[in-house]
Curated annotation (Swiss-Prot):
PROSITE patterns: RF_PROK_I. Keywords: Cytoplasm, Methylation, Protein biosynthesis. This is Peptide chain release factor 1. Peptide chain release factor 1 directs the termination of translation in response to the peptide chain termination codons UAG and UAA.
Length: 364
């Protein structure tokens, strides 16, 4: 789109912002807490864009003034040089603001603000794959804690040799899905397992699924489609063994999805958790079906969420993490310590760049 089209869209956003401010001053809306909160949230989202739009307009005015000043000082070489330097700086600022506002206008994934259920499954590699699944779980736990998210395991199938055959983690906070969605796919590890006596490097995998939490309104579950069983939650023995059947074994008969939840202290809490996981899994199926046609047109987009997609290799011998979507390497130790900001931000930037190529061809 042309620069004039960008300005027109920004004007529309600015008008919407002004309208929201008028609504916030309305006494009737002030007496409706839910509506007030909704309008305030929308205003808050638009405010950074409107501020950048105003900066862009100011920059355009400064560029125009500088060009007029340049015409008036053509015989003054020193002044001409100073004005040209100022124009270069202003044009750079304008270019940055164009990019920033264009990104802000890109279509948003409505699920980006949601919390998620993070499912990690051991893949190829036997016991080592289970241990690797546990390592990934700790990596995400550290990342979430660093940001300030609530990270809590809600369902786990432990391996006899350590780690997990399968683990579901609830990650709650602001805009969790917008960042963790890039983690969906196959994570491959190359290292010498602790049980390997010959020092040979083994390759193992674990699959990560990132499922945005679904509202009960979005996913209708017929109670007659559920088969619910109970069991005693496991413990370390003695007083820690749960003598009451608090664990929930939930089967959704139409899909065959089974959820076993043991982490909470009561049967009711485990049932609620199991239903949360089931809703997230069913919601993921709905999204995949709804996006089947669209997906063929978005093969190049980062973070498709395809479980068969190998997204990253972690090489312990070389202390290297390779993200195959980015074609970039990162130091292994910080990544496993939960310092995922660099790689996730790079994925976000890549996605935005590709979306801009489609959405914003010809901005000048």
């Amino acid at each position: 789109m042309e620069y004039s089209t960008l300005i027109a869209r920004l004007k529309t956003a600015s008008e919407s912002f002004e309208n929201l401010e008028v609504q916030l001053a309305d006494p009737d809306i002030a007496n409706d807490p839910k509506k007030l909160e909704s309008i305030a949230r929308e205003r808050s989202k638009l405010e950074p864009l409107v501020l950048d739009f105003n900066k862009l307009l100011d920059t355009d005015k400064e560029i125009e003034d500088s060009k007029n000043l340049l015409k008036e000082n053509r015989n003054d070489k020193e002044m001409e040089s100073l004005i040209n330097e100022e124009l270069i700086t202003l044009e750079e600022s304008k270019s940055e603001l164009i990019q920033k506002t264009t990104i802000a206008l890109l279509p948003k994934d409505p699920r980006d603000e949601r919390s998620v259920m993070l499912e990690i499954r051991a893949g190829a590699g036997g016991n080592e794959a289970c241990i690797w699944a546990g390592d990934l779980a700790r990596m995400y736990e550290r990342y979430g804690q660093k940001i300030g998210w609530s990270v809590k395991p809600v369902s786990a199938s432990e391996s006899d040799m350590g780690g997990f055959k399968e683990l579901v983690i609830s990650v709650k906070g602001d805009s969790v899905y917008s960042q963790l969605k890039f983690e969906a796919g196959v994570h491959r590890v190359q290292r010498v397992p602790a049980t390997e006596s010959q020092g040979r490097v083994h390759t193992s995998t674990a699959t990560v699924a990132v499922m945005p939490e679904a509202d009960p309104v979005e996913v209708k579950i017929d109670p007659t489609d559920l088969e619910v069983g109970t069991a005693r939650s496991g413990g370390a023995g003695g007083q820690n063994v749960n003598k009451v059947e608090t664990a929930i074994d939930l089967l959704h008969k139409p899909t065959g999805i089974r959820v076993f939840c043991t982490q909470e202290r009561s049967q009711l809490q485990n049932r609620e958790r199991a239903m949360e996981i089931l809703r997230a899994k069913l919601y993921e199926i709905q999204l995949k079906e709804a996006n089947a046609k669209e997906r063929s047109q978005r093969l190049s987009q980062v973070g498709t969420g395809d479980r068969s997609e190998k997204i990253r290799t972690y090489n312990f011998k070389d202390n290297r993490t390779t993200d195959h979507r980015l074609g970039s390497n990162f130091s292994l130790e910080p990544i496993l310590a939960g310092q995922l900001d660099e790689v996730i931000n790079a994925c976000i930037a890549q996605e935005q760049k590709r979306m801009m190529e489609d959405f914003n061809k010809g901005v000048n």
